[in-house]
């Protein structure tokens, strides 16, 4: 099984449903430690595999965006803890989404969970490890729209806005993990628009 075969299967299925998805990410092992790496070559058992799809509905022009992390076989304890930390961070961020809340506040929920779990972030000339990207972005007729959900740009989330929530952790040797869903901002909280389970170990 290769990244290319899975990418082809995903993009063919999306096309059959009236969508188009280019540059689908299916990255395993250390390839998954680069959030923008599409992935290539064999998908090995017992390695974390990030699958990120962002299809566009041809009839309306609107984008979707969703990421899940999988593993073929049984995860080791370090992989299990990493995945649980990312899931917990994502759920904490989603729970904090509400009209009027700053995007930086949502981002901080992710940082707090990772800090509590001892997941450090380092940045260097040869790459970064840990959590080194924003928590999310607006989504609509473009794949990346305002507002940004990050610590760099802070603005209140507006009612009706659609945003992604996609924290991740990346450590070469251990692998990468990212979980992403799309939510709509409401006056009472976040309305989950994604509809896919969180099962991740494929046995």
Go through the PLM ranges and name each one.
Residues 1-203:
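Active-site neighborhoods and metal-handling regions in enzymes and metal-associated proteins
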């Amino acid at each position: 099984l290769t990244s290319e075969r899975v990418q082809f299967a995903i993009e063919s299925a999306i096309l059959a449903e009236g969508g188009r998805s280019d540059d689908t990410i299916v990255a395993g092992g250390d390839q998954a430690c680069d959030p923008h790496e599409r992935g290539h070559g064999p998908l090995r058992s017992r390695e974390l595999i990030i699958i990120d799809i962002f299809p566009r509905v041809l009839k309306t022009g609107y984008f979707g965006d969703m990421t899940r992390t999988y593993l073929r076989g049984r995860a080791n304890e370090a992989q299990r803890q990493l995945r649980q930390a990312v899931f917990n961070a994502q759920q904490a961020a989603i729970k904090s989404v509400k009209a009027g809340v700053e995007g930086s506040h949502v981002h901080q929920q992710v940082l707090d969970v990772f800090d509590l779990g001892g997941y450090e972030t380092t940045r260097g000339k040869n790459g970064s490890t840990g959590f080194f990207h924003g928590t999310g972005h607006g989504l609509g007729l473009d794949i990346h729209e305002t507002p940004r959900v990050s610590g760099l740009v802070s603005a209140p989330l507006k009612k009706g806005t659609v945003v992604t929530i996609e924290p991740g952790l990346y450590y070469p040797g251990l692998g990468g993990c990212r979980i992403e869903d799309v939510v709509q901002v409401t006056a009472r909280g976040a309305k989950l628009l994604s509809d896919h389970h969180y099962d991740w170990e494929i046995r």
